[in-house]
């Protein structure tokens, strides 16, 4: 997902690059749905709102550590900028989980934009003598379905269905599509930790043959006794489990994530470039709020009263 780098990674965006699919942020307004038979107290709870700025802008710094590519056994750590931008429009919202709008005016369905970016790979031992992997950018639509909400709106279950087109910077240009449908759980005030948000997601990954070939194929001219020729075919690309925590203070935001990748059963698992079938990656970031709109909008309150008042 993007030029947002650490800000998105800390909220669950994953790799083949710096970041990817988002965990739902608490900052964007949500449309409330209430059971007509719910008790008055529960209705009052779900109707509670607070006034927040129409937009907020911030900047910070973070660090991420991840493999050169999925399946690599080489890990690098990078400092990354942490842009912070929130927009709470009626029909269009932007937050750390991306740009989104309501689809067909349905409360339970949203149309989002899914983004991702990767760093170049130049000195990987498994790819010695092969062309470097260029930085890539991925962009495409994502359908987000709100499956379930608790009465207090503090626990949310979503299903996300993204598909992105991937482009290598420079040659070869378009390298195919990538998709990672996932189940996403977002919890406000987990374990009584007021103001914190915990996000967890898991799901399979799929890619086009052209996409997998970019990372895992070995052309005959680059074959060696220890690295035989190999042609990636595309299809199932493994699975991921991710957890992220974040908290918004009056003047700054902080977040961190940890992710586990499993490549067992992936269509390319027998590629000589795959050196690790499972591994962990992580990141942390901070951002300071430097400007905000004077105009206020009402946002459903999913935080405990004391936290709401402190902000």
Explain the meaning of each model-derived region.
Residues 1-52, 292-311:
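Cleavable N-terminal export/targeting peptides
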Residues 44-55, 70-71, 90-109, 148-157, ...:
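Short loop/turn motifs that connect adjacent beta-strands in outer-membrane beta-barrel proteins
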Residues 55, 75-81, 107, 133-139, ...:
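Residues that define the transmembrane beta-barrel architecture of outer-membrane proteins
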């Amino acid at each position: 997902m993007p030029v947002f780098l650490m800000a998105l990674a800390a909220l669950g965006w994953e790799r083949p690059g710096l970041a990817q699919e988002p965990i739902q942020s608490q900052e964007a307004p949500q449309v409330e749905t209430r059971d007509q038979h719910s008790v008055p107290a529960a209705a009052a709870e779900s109707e509670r709102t607070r006034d927040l700025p129409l937009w907020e802008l911030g900047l910070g710094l973070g660090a991420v550590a991840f493999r050169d590519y999925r399946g690599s056994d080489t890990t690098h750590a990078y400092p990354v900028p942490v842009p912070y931008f929130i927009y709470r429009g009626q029909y269009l919202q932007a937050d750390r989980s991306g740009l989104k709008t309501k689809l067909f005016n349905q409360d339970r369905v949203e149309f989002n934009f899914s983004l991702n970016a990767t760093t170049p790979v130049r000195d990987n031992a498994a790819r010695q003598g092969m062309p470097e992997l260029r930085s890539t950018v991925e962009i495409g639509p994502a359908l987000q379905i709100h499956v379930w909400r608790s009465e207090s709106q503090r626990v949310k279950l979503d299903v996300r269905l993204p598909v992105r087109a991937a482009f290598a910077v420079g040659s070869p240009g378009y390298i195919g599509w990538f998709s990672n449908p996932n189940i996403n759980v977002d919890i406000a005030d987990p374990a009584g930790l007021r103001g914190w948000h915990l996000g967890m997601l898991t799901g399979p990954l799929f890619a086009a043959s052209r996409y997998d070939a970019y990372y895992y194929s070995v052309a005959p001219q680059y074959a060696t006794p220890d690295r035989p020729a190999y042609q990636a075919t595309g299809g199932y690309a493994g699975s991921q489990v991710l957890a992220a925590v974040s908290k918004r203070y009056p003047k700054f935001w902080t977040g961190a994530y940890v992710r586990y990748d499993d490549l067992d059963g992936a269509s390319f698992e027998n590629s000589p470039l795959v050196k690790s079938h499972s591994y962990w990656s992580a990141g942390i970031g901070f951002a300071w709020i430097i400007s905000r709109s004077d105009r206020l909008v009402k946002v459903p309150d999913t935080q405990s009263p004391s936290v709401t008042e402190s902000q």
